[in-house]
């Protein structure tokens, strides 16, 4: 079978919720496309090529036109829907091997870490992402993730400030909800 046929088969397995078969298929596709230990990049858009070259200090990589990273990412989302966060995280790790600068992959990884209770790793991963951030929405999410860490660590003052700060970059209902929760828990309003 050629790659296009395998991609269609992957999509059929995934659509019919045969996730193990879909996983085997995307692994087979990935194995077919790997190039002698050379770094690969499945970019979503041109800016990702620039980000990759800048942050990883190399132009020695293989640009792959097949969306292997998206296949792993979509499979991870299916596992997350089924509350299989360990398997989802594994697939997101593989997705990141194919696109090391795709913020969506990393944000999903942080969501898995939250569900797995891996708070230290959540904070570390989130902080590592700071260098890749170039949108207001992503910087806001960055601060919400750090705020989540402080909520879980029972440091509501820091969390409240970080949620407020995230809203300065991109207002979100999530941050508003968390601020309201913290205001109720602390018995006072958040300073402006």
What is each of the regions a protein language model found here?
Residues 33-41, 102-106, 133-141, 168-181:
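Boundary/linker segments of alpha-helical solenoid repeat arrays
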Residues 1-65:
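N-terminal alpha-helical interaction modules that lie
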Residues 44-45, 59-86, 90-143:
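Alpha-helical adaptor scaffolds
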Residues 4, 8, 67-70, 74, ...:
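"A position-specific structural signal for the A-helix of alpha-solenoid helical repeats
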Residues 158-192:
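Terminal, low-structured helical/coil segments at or just beyond the last alpha-helical repeat
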Residues 21-28, 87-93, 121-132, 158-165, ...:
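Alpha-helical repeat scaffolds
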């Amino acid at each position: 079978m050629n790659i296009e046929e395998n991609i269609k088969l992957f999509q059929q397995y995934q659509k019919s919720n045969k996730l193990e078969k879909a996983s085997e298929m995307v692994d087979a596709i990935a194995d077919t496309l790997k190039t002698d230990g050379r770094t690969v990049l499945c970019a979503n858009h041109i800016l990702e090529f620039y980000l990759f070259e800048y942050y990883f200090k190399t132009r020695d990589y293989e640009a792959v036109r097949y969306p292997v990273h998206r296949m792993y990412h979509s499979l991870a989302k299916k596992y997350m829907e089924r509350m299989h966060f360990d398997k989802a995280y594994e697939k997101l790790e593989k997705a990141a091997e194919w696109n090391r600068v795709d913020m969506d992959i990393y944000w999903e990884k942080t969501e898995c870490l939250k569900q797995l209770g891996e708070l230290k790793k959540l904070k570390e991963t989130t902080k590592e992402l700071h260098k890749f951030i170039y949108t207001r929405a992503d910087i806001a999410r960055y601060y919400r993730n750090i705020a989540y860490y402080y909520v879980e660590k029972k440091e509501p003052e820091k969390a409240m400030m970080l949620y407020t700060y995230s809203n300065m970059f991109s207002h979100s209902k999530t941050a508003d909800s968390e601020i309201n929760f913290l205001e109720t828990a602390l018995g006072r309003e958040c300073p402006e």
